[in-house]
Amino acid sequence: MSLDPVKKLVILAKSNIMQSNNMDALEAIRIKFLGKKGYLNQHIKNLNDTSLDIKPKLGAAINQAKEDIYTLLIERKNILQSKNIKNTLITDTLDVTLPGRLSDIGTHHPITSTIKRMKIFFNTLGFSVIHGPEIEDDYFNFDALNIPKYHPSRDEHDTFWFDEKRLLRTHTSGVQIRAMINKTPPIRIISFGRVYRKDYDQHHTPMFHQMEGLIVDSNVNFSYLKKILYDFLYNFFETDIILRFRPSYFPFTEPSAEIDVMKKQETGNWLELLGCGMVHPKILHHVDIDTEKFSGFAFGIGIERLTMLQYNIDDIRVFFKNDLQFLDQFK
C-alpha cells in the first residue's frame, strides 16, 4: 500500500471541511474521517497487510493525517462560531426605544416600617429596646401586674393556655416586670413583640404586635407621660390630628388613661389608640422598688392599630394575608 491514498484522504477532508456551513455538517465530516468506522481507521486496520518496509512510513502518515484533519476541523469550527455570533448580533439588535425590564424590589412590611419608626423616635429619648419570651407564665403575665384571679383576661375564651401556669402572652408587660427585677432605677425601656388573644374580626386577630414603654425614676409624673406620648403621636402621623386624654382603668396603672385620636378632616370620629398611666405602687413593691423614692409610668400601643390609622386601612386582617397587590402599595 502506498502513501498516496492517505494524502488524497487529507485533500478530500480539507475540501469537505471548507464547504461545510454549519456545526452539524462539520460534526458529520469529523465522524466520516476520524470516527471509529471512519476512513483513517480503515487504513489503520489495513496496516497488518502492508509490507514491513513501508509500514512505519504509512503509520506515521496516517497519524499526521489525523492531526492535519483535526486542526482543519478546529479552524473551521472557530470560523463558523464567529459567523454565528455576528449573525446573532445583526438579527438580535436591541431596540433602545423599548421600555426597560423593571426588577421587583423588596420593601419592608408596613408593620415592620412602623416598628422601625417607633424605635428611631424613642431611641432619641434615651429608651433602650429589650425583649422577652412569648410563652409566659401566669406570674409575669398576670400576678405581677396586679391582675386579679377573677379578671376576664385569664379566662380560656380570651387567652391561649398551655396548662395551668403557661400561656401565650396577652401583652408585652411581662418584659417590663423582668426589666424592673433585673435593673435598678433609673429605668427607661421599650419592648416590641407579638402577643396573642382569642379574637378574630375586622379589628382583631389572634396574633398582633404591641409596643410598651416604661420609665421608672425619681422625678416622674403624669404630665411628663402626656408630653412624651403627644410628641410621639404628632411626630408619627406628620399631619394635623387632634388628641384627647380620657380617664380609664387598668389593674397595673393608677391613675390610668387612654388616648384617642381624630384627624382634623374627620371631625367627630374619635379612635381609641393607646393606654397608659402611672405604674401602680403594688407593682413597684412586687419588684422591690422603693415607692418613697421612685415612681414610674407605662404605656402600650397596638402597632397594627397605629399602622391602620396611618394608612387609612379598615381591616387588620390584610396585614397577614401576604397579598402582593396590597403590599406593593408600600414600596
Swiss-Prot record:
A Pfam family annotated for this UniProt entry: Phe_tRNA-synt_N
Its required cofactor(s), as named, are: Mg(2+)
Question: Could you give the cofactor binding note from the entry?
Answer: Binds 2 magnesium ions per tetramer.
Q: Which reaction does it catalyse?
A: tRNA(Phe) + L-phenylalanine + ATP = L-phenylalanyl-tRNA(Phe) + AMP + diphosphate + H(+)
Query: What processes in GO biological process is this protein linked to?
Result: phenylalanyl-tRNA aminoacylation
Q: Does the keyword Lyase apply?
A: no
Listed GO CC annotations: cytoplasm
Keywords, in A-Z order: Aminoacyl-tRNA synthetase, ATP-binding, Cytoplasm, Ligase, Magnesium, Metal-binding, Nucleotide-binding, Protein biosynthesis
Q: What EC designation does it have? A: 6.1.1.20
Q: What is this protein called?
A: Phenylalanine--tRNA ligase alpha subunit
Q: Which organism is it from?
A: Blochmanniella pennsylvanica (strain BPEN)
Gene name, please? pheS
